[in-house]
Amino acid sequence: MTATRHPFASDIDAATRIAEPDFDLLDALVRTDDPDDQAHTLARVVLAAFDNYYAVSRRIPALAQAAFEARDWAATVRLSKIRLGLYTACIDQLVPLLKAGLPELANDEQLWARAEAELLAAIAERYEADFAFAFWQSLRRKLVSDEWRPVSYDTGPAARPKATSAAILKTIATTLPIRPAVIRDILDGAGLRGPWRDRDGDAALAAAAIEAALEPLGPRAGETAKIEIAESGFFRNRGACLVGRVRLRDRGDMPMRNLPLLIALLNEDDGLVVDAVLCDADELQYAFSSTLANYHATNPHYHELARLLHELMPKRPLGTQYSCIGFHHLGKVAVMTEILAEHRRSKEKLDTAPGFKGTVAIAFTMPSSAYVLKIIRDHPTDDYKFDYFDGLDAVLRKYNLVHEIDRAGSMLDNIIYSNVKLERTMFAPDLLDELLESGIDTVTLERGALVFRHLIVQIKLTPLPLYLTTASAADARAAVINLGDCIKNNAAADIFNKDLDGRNYGVSRIRKVYLFDYDAVEPLTDVRVRGDDAPPGPEFEDGVVFRPADMLGGLRIDDPALRRAFRDAHPELMQPEYWQGMQRALRAGKVPRVMNYPAARRLRR
């Protein structure tokens, strides 16, 4: 399918170009000897760099909407990559200039303190004051190579009032049953340019789907209701969605009832369509999962958006809600703050994560924590399957690669911290010993604390083989079938896990299967896929060689019934033609479709 080109496509470079630093300000900073003047100018230099970053980042959601309207799928992928790299690029542009002009700057604590006060005064009335302060902290840490600290943006000089979701919601009063005309008004309110295939028909189907989802809440005909819809479009790859909730008022026999709502939109050759309606918190959580590419939200009020998403998906920590709409640094701070709060609240020790001992990574967690932390070993264990280990930095690059791509709904995102310090008392003794013995290049003990050169944090999963030992027959069958979907989605993202071992996959709280270990991932387009007539083993060829016929044996699915369920659901995965066809599509620059919600929620036409 050839997408229509939108006039904006050739202007993406111009719209997302990072402006040059203000060299007049930089010159003034270098020339002045007055401490107060120097502090004031340094604050202005950094704030100008932040303003440049923030202005470009706020243009991207509108460009993503335009790309969706134009069906320019290559542009949507490009915009996601640009946005992911923008924050670091703006900091990296300024740091060498400051180092060259003021080499003593990194160690001048008094100057930094005065400049920080100037910056905080300048941003005091701005909505994005916390984000500007985060940028300041990131830049200083890059200059000084200092310890990473979770700076609190909810309290202190850059604080802002606590966000409430009501500020970004449009409320539509209605009565039950919900009429198609109400849904049509919501679709019209999205402001999407382009024809609809059948807007009235879609509105009727969506209204019926919402009515069916309301049934367990005991609705009554004529009962008043409110539909609250976020005044924001959410755009990602080939799709878009509208997000909100249906609220039924408290009545004598029933308390206030809330139903999450996501209306998923596609733009097909023959027009815009409502593809699915989701009204379950777990299903919304999957659609907004950090295992997918980030959404571009057209509403700039990121705190209110994150709060709304947390209200709709309360099982997911607030920190990850920021990340899924692209505010990774705020999400990074929120996640570490949550981990430290979990420890203070539970008094639990960090200890080896349940499951199988990693050959490349050491994974650890607290029993009640929502997160798993891991480091990369200096050297793999004796059980390592491959002849050659590329080393710690190469493995970290693979984790970063997964962070920077569309994870296709089947790979966990990673937060990678540098130079982070955790108190020694947080760790169980055996784990502490292993970290210090097997992570010499990564972990050091300094004055009662462990300092991590790198620390990877992911959402906690149950390793698939462990899950299968305790799951019901139905849940186990669903998991192995979902494993096949996971492998297909990874392939659609040009990711191949050459260690197709079930221990590298895990099951989430909402019973979805994800890949979570990335030391063995390779671009699928670089893999040599071979059939039965190929040489008998990879030792005959250079590079990564994959024989699909051998796949099932490596997955460690021991139960014959589960092996049969996997094979029956995904026979194409054992055929080289499937993999070679996916490689051809990826090399041609096509953006394969990825299912971000259950097929059962798609509207039946």
From Swiss-Prot:
One of its GO terms (cellular component) is cytoplasm. InterPro entries: AceK_kinase, AceK_regulatory, Isocitrate_DH_AceK. The active site is at D413. It is found in: Cytoplasm. Its EC number is 2.7.11.5, 3.1.3.-. Bifunctional enzyme which can phosphorylate or dephosphorylate isocitrate dehydrogenase (IDH) on a specific serine residue. This is a regulatory mechanism which enables bacteria to bypass the Krebs cycle via the glyoxylate shunt in response to the source of carbon. When bacteria are grown on glucose, IDH is fully active and unphosphorylated, but when grown on acetate or ethanol, the activity of IDH declines drastically concomitant with its phosphorylation. Belongs to the AceK family. This is Isocitrate dehydrogenase kinase/phosphatase. The gene is aceK.
